[in-house]
Structures are given as structure tokens and as C-alpha cells.
Amino acid sequence: LLQPPFIPSEEAVEWANRSVDFSKDCGAKVTSLIPTRTGNGAMDRLATAGQFTEPTLDQLEDAMDYGVGLARGRVFADLWDLGRFSSCETCFPQRKARLGKQNDTQQVPIRITCPSCR
């Protein structure tokens, strides 16, 4: 999971990367990066209590770039309801397409630059 509860936001990518490393060290051929979401009740209560924040699209891209860049088996990003993690409507379609391309090709494409948000 990317950005599980009780993990400070600034440590989320580091812990996701460590999870990818661990899965590969255990022999996993496929690893999925799943952004932790509110909406199931428990996460909502933790968010209200200040113990959970949803990850950002930047964090998912960072973790995917790391995982795919290792070239130690396949790494996939869960793209369901991805728009909730984006803060920019201008570049979101391109960034979503980039992650989809990563899922399909297992290559690390050039990052999208956006004059509106970056």
C-alpha cells in the first residue's frame, strides 16, 4: 500500500519502495502499488482523527518509477479512481496515461512536466 495509515506523508514513498524491495527479495514476480483510499469507514475515521492522508499522484509516480526502474519483475500501479490523487486537471490525463504505459511496457517514461502545477 502507498501511504498506509500512521505513516507520515513524507515517508510514504520510502516505505513503498522498501515494500517493493521486500517483495522482490522474497521472489515475487509481480508487485502492485495500491494507493490507500478513504471510503471504507475505517480510513475515513483515521483521516478525521488526523492519522491518515491519501497519497498524491506524485508519490505514486515516484514509487512506480522506482519499482519499474529496478527491472526485477513486474510492478503495476492501481489506476482505479486515480483522479482523486491529482491536484491538477491540466496534466492529469497525461500523467494517468504515463502510468498506464508503465503498467503495459514496464519501462520508465519521461515524467510529465506541467506549467500549471510544477
Residue positions per predicted region:
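Auxiliary Fe-S-binding modules of radical SAM enzymes
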Residues: 17, 22-118
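Short, catalytically relevant binding-site loops at active-site mouths
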Residues: 3-7, 37-40
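Canonical radical SAM enzyme core domain
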Residues: 4-18
